[in-house]
């Protein structure tokens, strides 16, 4: 079970309060906020509400100097909404699994929506609890 979670996902205000309270505890530190997954939280809401909430949330986090990594599961939210949301971020990271089903590999592509440039070829990667994302060939994936 996750340490921080929302039992009732039908309230963006509850999420905002939880996130704000959590971040206040680290106000004097550099913070990297990882939310997995925002797409499931946003399912019950309409397009305008999702976009307004997300735009305001990211603006507030940037003002506080907080680096956000938000995970969105592909295919959960409307494609148009995801395209617009993608423009709210400086960098987008696409993660997926590839290779044989018997031994799948984690793959990553990094890009900027505004320039339309993504890595042409996905790279293998691993995730370390100490160092974060480690690109192959530096790690066994």
Per-region residue spans from a language model:
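Phosphate-binding/switch loop-helix module in NTP-utilizing enzymes
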Residues: 1-62
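Phosphate-binding/switch region of NTP-binding enzymes
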Residues: 66-67, 71-132, 140-141
């Amino acid at each position: 079970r996750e340490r921080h979670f929302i039992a009732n996902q039908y309230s963006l205000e509850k999420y905002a309060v939880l996130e704000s309270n959590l971040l206040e505890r680290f106000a004097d530190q550099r913070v990297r906020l990882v939310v997995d997954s925002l797409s499931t939280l946003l399912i019950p809401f309409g397009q305008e509400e999702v976009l307004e909430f997300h735009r305001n949330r990211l603006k507030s986090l940037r003002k506080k100097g907080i680096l956000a990594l938000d995970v969105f599961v592909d295919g959960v939210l409307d494609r148009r909404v995801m395209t617009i949301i993608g423009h709210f971020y400086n960098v987008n990271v696409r993660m997926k699994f590839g290779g044989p089903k018997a031994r799948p590999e984690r793959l990553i592509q990094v890009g900027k929506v505004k320039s339309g440039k993504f890595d042409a070829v996905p790279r293998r990667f691993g995730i370390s609890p100490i160092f974060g994302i480690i690109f192959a060939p530096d790690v066994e994936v």
